[in-house]
């Protein structure tokens, strides 16, 4: 691992390249990027609006903005694999273990992981098994 933190402008450039219809806000004073896009994990899937909040050098936080609230599987009380049920903050990796290092591109890691999470979520809705 190189431990080289990728600048926000580079992260944003790649995100905008892959997702030209996305929206973003970048605050250079706080080194924070807020980025929104719509993901559809499969051709049969619903479309989900996600928001990624990334402060330079920290782990990105990923939220499902829409639909909100996300439906629950029959008999379930809470969403599985989330850090925050109400905010719908997805658990894509274990942040305290630094499983996502800041020398990785968000577009190549976090976004595909979020799409995969959404696909597993849809399977969970039908089967009740994550």
Question: What do these predicted regions represent?
Answer:
Residues 1-34:
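Charge-rich, low-complexity N-terminal segments
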Residues 5, 9-12, 76, 87-89, ...:
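Generic N-terminal initiation segments characterized by hydrophobic and/or small/turn-forming residues
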Residues 4-8, 35, 41, 121-124:
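Structural preference for beta-rich elements and adjacent junctions enriched in aromatics
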Residues 88-130:
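Ampiphathic alpha-helical segments that act as solvent-exposed interaction surfaces
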Residues 23-96, 104-105:
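Compact alpha/beta protein-protein interaction domains typified by the UBC
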């Amino acid at each position: 691992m190189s431990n080289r933190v990728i600048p926000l402008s580079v992260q944003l450039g790649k995100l905008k390249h892959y997702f030209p219809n996305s929206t973003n806000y970048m605050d250079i004073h706080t080194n924070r990027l807020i980025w929104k896009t719509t993901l559809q994990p499969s051709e049969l899937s619903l479309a989900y609006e996600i928001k990624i909040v990334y402060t330079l050098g920290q782990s990105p936080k990923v939220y499902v903005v829409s639909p909100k609230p996300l439906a629950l599987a029959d008999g379930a009380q809470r969403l599985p694999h989330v850090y925050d049920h109400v905010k719908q903050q997805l658990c894509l990796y274990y942040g305290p273990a630094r499983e996502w290092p800041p020398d990785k591109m968000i577009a190549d890691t976090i976004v595909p992981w979020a799409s995969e999470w959404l696909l597993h979520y849809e399977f969970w809705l039908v089967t009740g098994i994550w």
